[in-house]
Amino acid sequence: MQDAAAGGPPGLGGGGPPEERTDCIICCSAYDLSGHLPRRLYCGHTFCQACVRRLDTPAPEQRWIPCPQCRQSTPTPRGGVAMLDLDLAAFLAVKAEREPARLEPLPLTSLKGSAITRQPAGLCPALGPQPHFPQPRYCCWGCGSLCCPPLGSPEV
């Protein structure tokens, strides 16, 4: 396994390719969707949220999180460690492990023969009462207007 300090790319926790690393290299706990969320520091190394909280050290005017692998400091966001970016690759890998398998989508060939006869329910919100505009019944040959009184009646 390559390490970021050895010149390799920082993976999940800095200990290898993203598909291999799903645990924190500090506490050896597997990442999860609650207390051990994978948080990425500015240097690119990833550790669980619980360990990053322990690394968060107050300085005189700002709080900094020193990376235990490369020692680069990451400023603590205003909302704390929970506001650091998630390591999305690790998070999605953990989420995929935890969620039940999804059903396969229907093949497109089975949908080709069925005609759409009406709009699926819930697609658009129900509209309230619509204004009613009366249809013009008369046409004036003189001015071309559709709203003139009936032919043969006196014009005003």
Curated annotation (Swiss-Prot):
SUPFAM superfamilies, sorted: RING/U-box
Zinc finger (RING-type): 24-71
UniProt xrefs under Pfam families: zf-RING_UBOX (PF13445)
One GO MF term attached to the UniProt entry: zinc ion binding
Gene3D superfamilies according to UniProt: Zinc/RING finger domain, C3HC4 (zinc finger)
InterPro entries: RING_finger_domain, Znf-RING_euk, Znf_RING, Znf_RING/FYVE/PHD, Znf_RING_CS
Organism domain of life: Eukaryota
Entry keywords, A to Z: Metal-binding, Zinc, Zinc-finger
Annotated signal sequence range: none
Name of the molecule in the record: RING finger protein 224
Species the sequence originates in: Homo sapiens (Human)
